[in-house]
């Protein structure tokens, strides 16, 4: 397996409940290494740009409002098959459907406040990483 990178956001519901460390611990225990991390308060423009792919979906406005409601932690994760590894440890989007031991099953509040975002492909990971990080901010 090749070592690859993926992108993760610890969402406002998790940072509000002081779960940044718990989420990061679960990511690291799943074999992922944090090679870049910063706590930010997304602007409306950042959130709308990041989630532009969902612009025509009925939940877009609520998603943007949620993502700007408090601080988030954006991270670049590295590991073998990082996208899959991250998605596996995150669990299903709906915490009710997530497997025991996953971030969403153990820490999420609801399908909307589901604690984490993770890239769905290596291609999207590269785009999402570049959206928030300069190359020199990523140190492996």
Swiss-Prot record:
Catalysis performed (reactions): a 2'-deoxyribonucleoside 5'-diphosphate + ATP = a 2'-deoxyribonucleoside 5'-triphosphate + ADP; a ribonucleoside 5'-diphosphate + ATP = a ribonucleoside 5'-triphosphate + ADP
One GO location term (cellular component): cytoplasm
Keywords: ATP-binding, Cytoplasm, Kinase, Magnesium, Metal-binding, Nucleotide metabolism, Nucleotide-binding, Phosphoprotein, Transferase
Binding-site residues, ATP: 11, 59, 87, 93, 104, 114
Gene Ontology annotations of biological process type: CTP biosynthetic process; GTP biosynthetic process; UTP biosynthetic process
Active site: 117
CDD domains: NDPk_I
UniProt xrefs under SMART domains: NDK (SM00562)
GO MF annotation list: ATP binding; metal ion binding; nucleoside diphosphate kinase activity
Subunit structure: Homotetramer.
HAMAP family, A to Z: NDP_kinase (MF_00451)
Family: Belongs to the NDK family.
Function: Major role in the synthesis of nucleoside triphosphates other than ATP. The ATP gamma phosphate is transferred to the NDP beta phosphate via a ping-pong mechanism, using a phosphorylated active-site intermediate.
Protein name per Swiss-Prot or TrEMBL: Nucleoside diphosphate kinase
Gene: ndk
């Amino acid at each position: 397996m090749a070592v690859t990178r993926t992108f993760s956001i610890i969402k406002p519901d998790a940072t509000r409940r002081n779960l940044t460390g718990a989420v990061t611990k679960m990511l690291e225990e799943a074999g992922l290494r944090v090679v870049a991390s910063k706590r930010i308060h997304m602007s409306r423009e950042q959130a709308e740009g990041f989630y532009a792919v969902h612009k025509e979906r009925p939940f877009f406005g609520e998603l943007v409002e949620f993502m700007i409601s408090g601080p988030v932690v954006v991270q670049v994760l590295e590991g073998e098959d990082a996208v899959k590894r991250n998605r596996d440890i995150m669990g299903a989007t709906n915490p009710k459907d997530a497997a025991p031991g996953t971030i969403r099953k153990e820490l999420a509040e609801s399908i909307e406040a589901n604690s984490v975002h993770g890239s769905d492909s290596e291609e999207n990971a590269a785009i999402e990483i570049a959206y928030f990080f300069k190359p020199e901010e990523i140190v492996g």
